[in-house]
Amino acid sequence: ALPIEENIKNTQEVVAYAHAHGVSVEGEIGSIGGAEEGVVVEKDAAMYTKPEDALHYVNETHVDALAVSIGTTHGQFKSKAKINYELLKELKAKLGPVGLVLHGGTGVSDEDMKRCVREGMKKINVGTELNKNYIEVVSKTFTADDVTPLTSLRNLLGPANERIKEIVIDKASLFKL
């Protein structure tokens, strides 16, 4: 993670360009921890989003949404996340209308996900769950006995796409409170 002032400077440039073109911007401060794109970052108490840093970052950058660290890690699917709801409430109170984003949502239970939404989270990323399921289905499909060099890719990738669709519909239903 970049030092906060360097992050602010870079984000200000992105926001100026994006907003001039009608595009919203999601920012992130600190480090979520976990593994993403092959990079592993250890999670510790220092990685939780500090409300005063979040407020400073939002006030300086004017991002539309902010990814906050409240107890999840990127790439988490073997263990259950321990969400710090007091921190979530404090961040929501300080940041007001800025959309809060939860990275590392794959390790979050449905009940915790619903509570995060009730308490102000506007977006929850579940990329690891989608990747894991897609790879599992594709692996089975590509190694089936009836696959030949002439098999259509639509037939090979279709089942994985359907599985992703099912997961997305299921996760989206958690946002309907």
PLM features: what roles do these ranges have?
Residues 1-98, 110, 114-119, 139-140, ...:
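Alpha/beta enzyme core
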Residues 63, 103, 156-157:
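Generic hydrophobic/packing signal
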Residues 109-177:
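C-terminal alpha-helical cap/extension of soluble enzyme domains
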Residues 100-108:
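Glycine-rich beta-to-alpha transition loops that act as phosphate-gripper elements at the mouths
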